Amino acid sequence: MKRSFIGILIFLGLWLIMVQSCMKFRISDSKAKEQFEKVGVPLTTATVKLGSSQMHYAKTGNDSLPTIVFVHGSPGSWDAFSLYMQDKDLLKQYRMISIDRPGFGYSNFGDAKHIDEQSALISPLFNLWKNGKPIYLIGHSLGGPMLIQLNADNPGLCKGLVLLAGSVDPAEEKKEKWRYILDAGIISYLLPGAFKPSNKELIFFKKDIYSLQNKFAFVKCKVIIVHGTQDSFVPVGNATYAQSKLVNADSVRLILIPGANHFIPWTKYETIKQILLALN
């Protein structure tokens, strides 16, 4: 009996170690640079200390060009947009930067934050990136509402926003009460890798999405909303809702992709690429 109990403890210990080391949805700087080198694209990575926190990002392209900043969803990391950052056509027009949002990748991995707290950590980076040329923000899924928050916190910063399957409508946000169970005690430690901070920030977002509503009025640049009509994770109603809320935007263009799912940055790569090429 005693041996069985010890065996169970050892198994649980090994399981905890395994799940926390797997599925982090991130890539080391050295491996990423190696992959980019194979396609002939120099990659720069950096980690910036901000008090007790750190922000990690990757960059490609000429520093004298207009900038595209990619903001990933949940879970995820900067390399969700690797294909775009390697694209030779995009590189002719843009410098491209992709961040690890707080709690993911190498930006204090595991420490989930509310979106206003995330914005407070991301915003100082723009001072490092300013080059006198336009900045465009591209956000997928939970990266979509991050764009609204960032724009409100940094008035006049961006020339344009592109929301890809962005979650912004409180009425469309699923209750998902099971997330609170997964966040409780030892159960939370059984969640593998990036799923733990993802679960936590999605719990936060159930409240954050309401405080986000008064941020739309601060968006005064042009906005493009792209959404798949068959998105089962973030229903297409979010797209039309965003369009109705962006009353002060310079312009709002809604692009609905028939039959497309939630993963349009990858399943509809050419469509998104052409949208980005036409931004500037």
Q: Model-predicted segments: where are they?
A:
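Conserved HGGG/HGGXW glycine-rich cap/lid loop of the alpha/beta-hydrolase fold
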Residues: T60-G105
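Active-site loop/oxyanion-hole signature of alpha/beta-hydrolase fold enzymes
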Residues: S98-I135
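Flexible "cap/lid" loop of the alpha/beta hydrolase fold
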Residues: P145-A152, L161-S188
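Active-site nucleophile elbow and catalytic-triad environment of alpha/beta-hydrolase enzymes
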Residues: N199-K215
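Short beta-strand/loop motif that positions the catalytic acidic residue
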Residues: V219, I225-H227, D231
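Short alpha-helix in the alpha/beta-hydrolase fold that links the catalytic acid
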Residues: C221, P235-K245
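Acidic catalytic loop of the alpha/beta-hydrolase fold
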Residues: Q230-V234, H262-F263
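Catalytic histidine-centered segment of alpha/beta-hydrolase-like enzymes
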Residues: A260-Y269
